[in-house]
Amino acid sequence: MFLINLLLLIVPVLLAVAFLTLIERKILGYMQFRKGPNIVGPHGLLQPIADAVKLFIKEPLRPLTSSIYMFILAPILALSLALTIWVPLPMPLPLIDLNLGLLFILSVSGLSVYSILWSGWASNSKYALTGALRAVAQTISYEVTLAIILLSIMLINGSFTLTTLNLTQEFMWLVVPTWPLMLMWFISTLAETNRAPFDLTEGESELVSGFNVEYAAGPFAMFFLAEYANIIIMNALTVILFFGTYHLIFLPELSTTNFMVKTMLLTSLFLWVRASYPRFRYDQLMHLLWKNFLPITLVTCLWYIMFPTMLSGTPPQM
């Protein structure tokens, strides 16, 4: 029974990832005054299936000087970690209800950088290694702000369990009192998922394709799936943290639809950002985090600790 539930979670995620690639190409196409994919199937709807078939029937080539085991394990690890993060998500009920669901998500998303590092190291290519080292520095840096923002949200929520966030936001979304945190969280998730304007790990103009430059066929497709699964999971987490999914008080049975629509809108915003902004320079990226985001998030975290402590001695007001 558990395996059936697991499949019912994984298969829709993979389908969503496949069609997200199509939506991205369509949106970028229309923003650049062209059509995008429109040949394969009606309005290009079968393009992701054609891409998947093409990639998985090709021969998975590898460089002669590469470390074979690590080279093959890296994309498998990337995809398995990207799918593991979905386990504690309440939609509205999680697959496994973890007491420390948020810590689990934070730690697993931090582990995903190992797959990038392994792929860059095992490829035995200077471009791949440079991209991988950039990814490590970027991910480790932005994990700090993500953790502090999560701590602030947990102080308001009073629990590390994701399902209690729905109850906390029954009457007001947390984005209203914590909108600066939400903006910093959204920008940090862009950096965490290596998306434009923070896609320094796969900078085409300088690193050919970054850490996955030596990959082809199936392993490349697995990296691709992992990247887009991470995009959807980060937006789903943003919805759970800041845009409570139980806000439809009169129709609670529509909470899953509500959750999906909000996640789709935030994912579209990711694509819009990619179409609009040029790539950041590396020193600007680090400056934004260590000199702007980190002090602000620390101050807000201290405020959320201090405010309830100050008011704890006051009598209840009528």
Swiss-Prot record:
GO terms for cellular component: mitochondrial inner membrane. PANTHER family: NADH DEHYDROGENASE SUBUNIT 1 (PTHR11432), NADH-UBIQUINONE OXIDOREDUCTASE CHAIN 1 (PTHR11432:SF3). This is NADH-ubiquinone oxidoreductase chain 1. Signal peptide: none annotated. InterPro entries: NADH_UbQ_OxRdtase_su1/FPO (IPR001694), NADH_UbQ_OxRdtase_su1_CS (IPR018086). It catalyses: a ubiquinone + NADH + 5 H(+)(in) = a ubiquinol + NAD(+) + 4 H(+)(out). It is an enzyme of class 7 (translocase). It is found in: Mitochondrion inner membrane. Belongs to the complex I subunit 1 family. Core subunit of the mitochondrial membrane respiratory chain NADH dehydrogenase (Complex I) that is believed to belong to the minimal assembly required for catalysis. Complex I functions in the transfer of electrons from NADH to the respiratory chain. The immediate electron acceptor for the enzyme is believed to be ubiquinone. It comes from Tachyglossus aculeatus aculeatus. One of its GO terms (biological process) is aerobic respiration. It holds the Pfam family NADHdh. It is a multi-pass membrane protein. The gene is MT-ND1. Keywords: Electron transport, Membrane, Mitochondrion, Mitochondrion inner membrane, NAD, Respiratory chain, Translocase, Transmembrane, Transmembrane helix, Transport, Ubiquinone. Its EC number is 7.1.1.2. GO terms for molecular function: NADH dehydrogenase (ubiquinone) activity. Its main location: mitochondrion. The chain crosses the membrane at residues 3-23, 68-88, 100-120, 144-164, 171-191, 231-251, 254-276, 293-313.
